[in-house]
Structure formats: C-alpha cells, structure tokens
UniProtKB/Swiss-Prot annotation:
It comes from the Bacteria. It is an enzyme of class 3 (hydrolase). This is dCTP deaminase, dUMP-forming. Pathway: Pyrimidine metabolism; dUMP biosynthesis; dUMP from dCTP: step 1/1. It catalyses: dCTP + 2 H2O = dUMP + NH4(+) + diphosphate. The gene is dcd. Pfam families: DCD (PF22769). GO terms for biological process: dUMP biosynthetic process; dUTP biosynthetic process; nucleobase-containing small molecule interconversion. Keywords: Hydrolase, Nucleotide metabolism, Nucleotide-binding. The record marks G109, W110 as: Important for bifunctional activity. Its EC number is 3.5.4.30. DCTP binds at R95, S96, S97, L98, G99, R100, D112, T120, L121, E122, Q141, Y155, Q162.
Length: 177
C-alpha cells in the first residue's frame, strides 16, 4: 500500500519515519520530494571496471551548483538523511521536470525496509547540452509503501548509514562465502 501525504506526515511526526532535515513543503500527495546535497562522486579514467575489486571514485563537494555534461554519469546524494522502520519500504523516482530535460535520476531506486542513510542517486545526462544542478534543489521523489507484514530480514547491508555520494561496493558481494 502506497502511503498518502497524511500518513507520511503522521509517520514523520511520530518518528516512525525519520527525515532530517524535513521540509513539510516537500510533501506531495503520495510522495516526499528530496533535495540535492553538495556531494558528488565520479569514476576517473579506467581501462576497465572489475567488479570484484574496490573501485576508487573521486568525491567532491560544491558550494552552489555543478554541471553534468552530455553523456556524463556521476553519483550524487540527497540532502536528507532517512531512516525507515522495518515495516516501510520506499521507491526513489526521478522528477518528471528533470527527466524532460534528459536527466536520468537513479537506476537502482529501491530502498529496503530498515534502511538508514542519505540516498545515493545515479545521474546521467542524456541531453546534448550540459545541465546545471543546484545544491538544495528538489531532485527526486521518495514513494513510501507499507509491507503486508514485518519481514524476517530487514536491511543491514553495505550501504547502511551511508553519507554523501557513495560509490559502488559490489566487490563486497564476492567476499561472502
């Protein structure tokens, strides 16, 4: 069941869902707009990406804005730090207004029940023009859904409590035996 604005607000006010900082004007009828932080990360020139090995990414902070060039892929993060209870999951959706400019936001937009942290966004500029993005702008929407029952496993993965634009940790999947 997708949560309405009334339920989202009730859950935030009762601390069932944590959103810091919370801006009530970001609440939509069935979602919460999240804002762009000042942290981005990108992968520097590589011959090949070996997913079994840690991949170094350059993380930078910006004061007011950054420009994403045509065909460029980078990671960004939300300003908001969220914490979901064990009975709520969420979907990250790009904003239509940005999609209409050719900016693709996220390709891994699932937030598991029990997740805590800033959300890393995967950004890609499919336009033939550079796009200027500003710190604090509404960048994506978070749609909350209530699970039919408490799961036997809640999220305790490698991105728990992440802050800032967090590069891939897929190499850790290969360490599991």
């Amino acid at each position: 069941m997708i949560l309405s604005d009334k339920t989202i607000l009730d859950y935030i006010k009762s601390s069932k869902i944590i959103v810091e900082p919370f801006d009530e004007s970001s609440l939509q009828c069935s979602s919460l707009d999240l804002r762009l932080s000042n942290s981005i990360a990108f992968y520097e020139e590589l011959d090949i990406i070996d997913i079994k090995s840690p991949i170094q990414a350059k993380t930078v902070t910006f004061e007011e804005y950054f420009i994403i060039n045509p065909g460029e892929f980078l990671l960004a993060s939300t300003m908001e730090y969220i914490k979901l209870p064990e009975f709520i999951t969420a979907f990250v959706e790009g904003r239509s207004s940005l999609g209409r400019l050719g900016l693709f936001i996220e390709n891994a937009g699932w937030v598991d029940a029990g997740f805590e942290g800033q959300i890393t966004l995967e950004l890609y500029n499919a336009n033939k023009y550079p796009i200027k993005l500003y710190k604090g702008m509404r960048i994506c929407q978070l749609v909350f859904a209530k699970l039919d029952e408490i799961p036997s496993k809640v999220y305790r993965g490698k991105y728990l409590c992440q802050k800032g634009a967090t590069p891939s940790k897929i190499f850790m999947d290969f360490d599991k035996k």
